[in-house]
Amino acid sequence: MKLFVPALLSLGALGLCLAAPRKNVRWCAISLPEWSKCYQWQRRMRKLGAPSITCIRRTSALECIRAIAGKNADAVTLDSGMVFEAGLDPYKLRPVAAEIYGTEKSPQTHYYAVAVVKKGSNFQLDQLQGQKSCHMGLGRSAGWNIPVGILRPFLSWTESAEPLQGAVARFFSASCVPCVDGKAYPNLCQLCKGVGENKCACSSQEPYFGYSGAFKCLQDGAGDVAFVKETTVFENLPEKADRDQYELLCLNNTRAPVDAFKECHLAQVPSHAVVARSVDGKENLIWELLRKAQEKFGKNKSQSFQLFGSPEGRRDLLFKDSALGFVRIPSKVDSALYLGSRYLTALKNLRETAEELKARCTRVVWCAVGPEEQSKCQQWSEQSGQNVTCATASTTDDCIALVLKGEADALSLDGGYIYTAGKCGLVPVMAENRKSSKYSSLDCVLRPTEGYLAVAVVKKANEGLTWNSLKGKKSCHTAVDRTAGWNIPMGLIANQTGSCAFDEFFSQSCAPGADPKSSLCALCAGDDQGLDKCVPNSKEKYYGYTGAFRCLAEDVGDVAFVKNDTVWENTNGESSADWAKNLNREDFRLLCLDGTTKPVTEAQSCYLAVAPNHAVVSRSDRAAHVEQVLLHQQALFGKNGKNCPDQFCLFKSETKNLLFNDNTECLAKLGGRPTYEKYLGTEYVTAIANLKKCSTSPLLEACAFLTR
């Protein structure tokens, strides 16, 4: 079976070099039958040589999680619900390998939880109250946890007063929820079809139990909606004409055909995963063990021992019997990224109080990059009356990850990062709009975005330096992966040279976010104490537009890649910063692609490319709310806001361009909720995609895994 690309296999082989001298993995078994299978596995692996396996027995998945966190075991396989538990404090375990299901031609590492209804029934997801519901079983992901978690805001549930089942029983007019206590909650068993003691039973003795049972409950007309997984409809209705009689309820309160489950689902549920410690977790060794084990004992590999099989009368020991193999999970993926925001939200909704849930739904959590942005964000939060609160990360990629996990809601990004965020599933919400002579008569909020000019700036005194003579010079960049400072100039250079060896093109550089040991970080300065050199946030003195221009102004670099406004904002007395207050605009020139140079006043005829405006991004399910809150916030704290400058200004910073660009006039609406490709434009997306062939980022690798 060929389920692994060479890159994944080579990553597994890397464990040979990086593993501890004693190549042993302590596997945690949660029962005597599991321990017995583990012992059989141990014996067979011993014959193959390293890595070896030792079997540790505990009484439950939670006990295994504790053993791994306490360094008394190394690995265990968990379902998605327990992966969530394992990722919480104090355990902080992360998934390192995922089980693969499906077929060799169509391998899957997740399924979709969906709400199925009959075509012609006249209600949407937010109109389910009073309808009749069919569930596969109490406590099951697709049949209970996810739909009930998503419906939680509509439930009249006081946590301390009653169990959740009581609120669900009142919400639906009648239900079939196998495994529930029918005496305590008769309404939740009312639609079930089992006879006598088998009514509402937690087994196939109840005809409406399980995925197919819940769908049959809908088919028979007993219920109005069935909560199942996407394959259930296809398995029970192989003919398209029959499937066309059913539809899916979408989170945006619309309906879609049953084959549109990738766009219309309640949540994506990942497969079972092997978890390990986040620090000193032996993940390379664990992957080597799994890779060798599946090669020798995987599907149809061995009669004497089957890794994905259990003795008669037993099921899913150590791994699911239906698994085909494993795929390695990228190191950037923690438990929250693995589970996804929709699934996480559903689980959180089942745990939080009504007050916590309301607060989370109404506020917007903004992600600040670095301490200076955090400080400004805290001021914003205080002035907003906590309508906006703050999360903080050390890099933009880490902020994007927080939004993906639902730990933050939004941030404003440069076009290069919009590309990354878009590849990860986030969407543009509003654009930073500057003053415009072309559309001066239009309301800024409704005005089309015009983009900005990416330029290469040099000192006038550096005579003879042109675009064609940059090789071997010293360069200043806003940050790796940013538009004007990296993507545009380095994309042009890569196209001209046919090489991705950027560290060899320039003699030295400051490109925050690059490898600190490389020449691309040689010119960076860090903070006032010389710490955090080359970090992609405001701790690095030469980070961002202003930082890259300062790098040039202080004669550290020969050329700065910035936007055309940067020179104007930091010369001729426009900036009060000590390093900039005496700078003259006439002392700088622009490099044109034709090999000439021009004054900075002639940027319209001497630029590298037109770059898309910075834009706010969020998850699609939060986009409308983020826009609503931002419109209100800029009415208070925008350029012409009633509380700016007296209390707080969104588009003004003590240093430069914190949270938003300082030259932003307003945040503008984006008509029709465009995709990231449409917002950035085909040419720009193609250019970045080509540049990413030179090098990708851990976050892009993680998102490629999560969205495949």
Swiss-Prot record:
Record Gene3D superfamilies: Periplasmic binding protein-like II
Name of this protein: Lactotransferrin
GO BP term (any one): negative regulation of tumor necrosis factor (ligand) superfamily member 11 production
Annotated residues for binding of hydrogencarbonate 1: R140, A142, G143
Gene this protein is translated from: LTF
EC number: 3.4.21.-
PTM: Poly-N-acetyllactosaminic carbohydrate moiety seems to be needed for TLR4 activation.
Localization, UniProt: Secreted; Cytoplasmic granule
Organism annotation: Capra hircus
Residues engaged in binding Fe(3+) 1: D79, Y111, Y211, H272
GO cellular component terms attached to this protein's record: early endosome; extracellular space; plasma membrane; recycling endosome; specific granule
